[in-house]
């Protein structure tokens, strides 16, 4: 598995964004009456705003995460492009525009009444072809110090040469992420990851009645066009991640309130790129992108998400699970805790019948660091270790009791006889067991020490034993 994502590393990432650059205008006002001229609302405009859109909004999302970005694409030689460049420069985005005299900057004007979108006017002309060797040379130069490339395709023509852009980046060993609008996915052959929404995906493969059909058709595209993965965004249904190998992964949507989905796809691909650049794998990146999407749709217009917002959301999710986490969720929480400089302590056991000796031991373990992880043998694992009459309490019951203890931050189940594999994934700063073990006997201890961690033991509180308690109960 790839190194766990430390989102503080976003600020070290350098990302190239190439695509259809737009200017988004917003006219806000009150719509309190119907026009006498036609059955349409009259909006009394009291606020006007301009924001970067399309590929420019992707670049804004990347910068909001703390990463550096170079933005490239085609605009008109007009007031809109100059206004756009001013907005982007204020956000420290390096712009490399190819200006065309006979081509307008794509502009979208949205009219809103009481913050509800009533009308959108598009000012655009699709670009068939353009020649600019200077822009291509600039792109080639930028690849030498980039960690990822985003190609933002809104089907306006800036990516007519997308095959060459993908090829040059892949030759440099860079991941290429594409937000596709074209129904011809062969154009993106060789890209690392595609992030279509469900409508865009079904426009290519046809309607999918089940998740299995969705996965099957995505996997066929992956093999046909040499993609490494496809991430399908599905609105309220969340996301589906399909990779070359392994089963598809469904991620449940996090948004409770949706104000505006404008630009949500831009946020998703920006977080995916930053996460891959920070050393994450597709699943870890998709978890964060899914979380970010849930945050951005609560905002009005094409908005962005920041690292502090992601951190807060991560902590809220951890708290909402009452300490019981899957292995994947645990690794994400640990990475975030490490980014805060926290010391991770880990222990494990069956914890079939919790007693005062356990409480004493766990409180002593927590005192060694900031976060305490308790890995718990699942029922089959306990049965193999303790016999057919154990456990007395089910895995879920044992984990719920453990989470009630103030000393414990996260509880995670494991199915093997020992948690050695899980410990190797987490690599805590301190691995702890009871005093009846020698450090050399502790599963996973060697890997922890190799990583610079410590393996420690805590004296057992005399007079307490789960096995003796069980014997008393049975007799």
Swiss-Prot record:
UniProt-annotated binding residues for ATP: 197-200
Molecular function terms from GO: ATP binding; heptose 7-phosphate kinase activity; heptose-1-phosphate adenylyltransferase activity; phosphotransferase activity, alcohol group as acceptor
Assigned keywords, A-Z: ATP-binding, Carbohydrate metabolism, Kinase, Multifunctional enzyme, Nucleotide-binding, Nucleotidyltransferase, Transferase
Record-linked Pfam families: CTP_transf_like (PF01467), PfkB (PF00294)
Gene Ontology process terms (BP): ADP-L-glycero-beta-D-manno-heptose biosynthetic process
CDD domains cross-referenced by the UniProt entry: RfaE_like
Catalysis: reaction(s): D-glycero-beta-D-manno-heptose 7-phosphate + ATP = D-glycero-beta-D-manno-heptose 1,7-bisphosphate + ADP + H(+); D-glycero-beta-D-manno-heptose 1-phosphate + ATP + H(+) = ADP-D-glycero-beta-D-manno-heptose + diphosphate
Any GO CC annotation of this UniProt entry: cytosol
EC number(s) recorded for this UniProt protein: 2.7.1.167, 2.7.7.70
Disulfide links within the chain: none
Similarity field: In the N-terminal section; belongs to the carbohydrate kinase PfkB family. In the C-terminal section; belongs to the cytidylyltransferase family.
Function: Catalyzes the ADP transfer from ATP to D-glycero-beta-D-manno-heptose 1-phosphate, yielding ADP-D-glycero-beta-D-manno-heptose.
Entry protein name: Bifunctional protein HldE
Species: Coxiella burnetii (strain Dugway 5J108-111)
